Amino acid sequence: FARGRRILPAIRRRQGTRQPLPLSGMQEEGFGVFDSAEWLQAQTPSAGAKCSARGLAKLAAVMANGGSAHGHQLLTESGCAALHAEPIERKMTIMDNRFTQAGLALFDDADGAKGPLEAGMNCGRDGFYGWMGLGGSVFQWHPRKRIGFAYVPTALNPIDLFNERGKSYQKAVVQCLDTMS
């Protein structure tokens, strides 16, 4: 209930500014639209990705380690540095977010002071780069701590707007690493 109280004011402010749905059929199909032939042909990587947590975690490990892992160089160090460079702050729908020049979200605990939505999104993910998906999925990495992390739930939870399930596992991984060092 506390989470709902955090986001209700922002949702109420948006209700007067209804935007058309970006793809025809979304109203009728709901989440099933992500499996439609049209959506799959669009190859929209930020929505409806078909991947496993293991595959995403391997890629996140590469990103967290300067572009290479297990003796395989997938991205040059300069390419990796450019990918993470020049974060800027922009409003994305109902809250402020920080993105690099390559479109990576950068999470900063300090952004939590801006409001309850920013706190829900950022607090507990300080220093991580990457993305989250509708329903609870998390694909992020932490270059300073050299952590690659992915969580892909089997049960879609559309009301988990801040991906709290994945965040709890993410925090546990960071705590384990901090305990070991």
What are these regions (language model features)?
Residues A49-S52, T76, G166:
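Generic structural signal for well-ordered, non-membrane alpha-helical segments
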Residues Q140, R146-A155:
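Short, well-ordered beta-strand elements
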Residues A53-K58, K167, K171:
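A structural signal for well-ordered alpha-helical segments within the folded catalytic domains
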Residues D109-A110, A155-P158:
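Short Gly/Pro-enriched loop/turn and capping motifs at secondary-structure junctions
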Residues N65-S68, S78-G79, H84-M92, I159-S181:
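Short, gly/Ser/Thr-rich active-site loops of penicillin-recognizing serine hydrolases
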Residues L56, A60-L75:
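Bacterial peptidoglycan biogenesis and beta-lactam-recognition machinery
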Residues F1-A47, C51-A53, A85-R144, M180:
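Active-site Gly/Thr loop motif
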